[in-house]
Amino acid sequence: MSVTSQAEKARQSALKLQGYSTNDKNKVLSAIAEGISAYKDFIISENKKDLDIFPDKTSALFDRLLLNEKRVMQMVEGVRAVIDLKDPVGEVTAEWDRPSGLHIKKVRAPLGVVAIIYEARPNVTVDAAVLCIKSGNAAILRGSRQALNSNRAIYKVMSEAVEKAGFDKDIVQFIDDASHDGAKELLTCEKSVDLVIPRGGEGLKKFVLENSLIPVLASAGGNCHIYVAKSADLQKAVDIIENSKCNKPSTCNAVEHILIDKSIAKDFVPILNVRMRACGVKVLADEFCHSLDNETTLAADADYDMEFLALTLTEKVVSGVSDAIDEINRRGTRHSECIVTEDKAEAEKFTTLVDAAATYVNTSTRFTDGFEFGFGAEMGISTGKMHARGPIGLEQLTSERYIVESDGALRK
């Protein structure tokens, strides 16, 4: 079946899905959770086929591709968490009366058909499907060739579970064609698809934006900063940086760049770098920070634009909060940015002027996540400004429409 035909099939199934009650949708999700749990060994064995042929087994992408029993069961827990979330469809977000006799309600409604194009992340196959179903949207899944066996296996388990439960399995479509041509064909199905979400690095985001005839909700990489201000609690700053870098360095919300107020650098750089070395982190430093610790490596200018996704970070001194804000807005990707400070006015200036989906005060950047924000599973982190920004959960997969009632009102 062609990609275009699959998109048309998804459009027809979306109309059926919009008639499902919350209870119906939760039954579908429950069937998916039970299916994944029952067939976890099959999923892991198919994942191993992808792992065996993956070229760089030390890369961040390899870690994202890897599935084991713990990670598969985390996917199951994620599905069950979405079951417990409030269904946004039909929620009245505003309601008012007009002198003309109109009673107007603004109501949340599904988008229709959502296509997700993603890289070597088999967990997205589950997250995207269940979030779309719960929010009343049909899903079209197009993963990468690096995860093709894993994605096929997960989709097969989900599809069979949904059909066995007595529901329309076509509410989730899987594009088996992992080529660029297949992706381009999907991106031209504007008559069938309402929204496309790229989930991956800047290259994928650029490809989708350049080729799509469908509105795009960009979920891109992170180039996250932590600014340590002159009023910062230095021990608190070290702990926050360690968690933001080392908790899971392959994620887009891991910190990559440390900006340090020059007035505290002599005190802070040595204690930070002792901790970083203990954690196995490679530090790329500007000339001033390198002069304080010659065990660091001198950073090149291009390093400050890098998303390392590994145990590497940069250190750079700045002359104050305004300088830090300028650096972040110039080099950041509008993802997650943090200030460590004990000065409330300085914190307010930072959170007001830094252009990012999430700004943090004395908090690890690792919290930019659907589960941590209480959204359940997420479709990605939107770094754009239109429609939705930050973690893409259920509400972000709906739009608002108007229901207007009257007792025969006529416009004069």
Residue map of PLM features:
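Structural motif
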Residues: 112-116, 130-131, 137-140, 170-173, ...
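Conserved C-terminal structural/oligomerization subdomain of aldehyde/semialdehyde dehydrogenase
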Residues: 300-412
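N-terminal Rossmann-like NAD(P)+-binding subdomain of aldehyde/semialdehyde dehydrogenases
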Residues: 1-106, 131
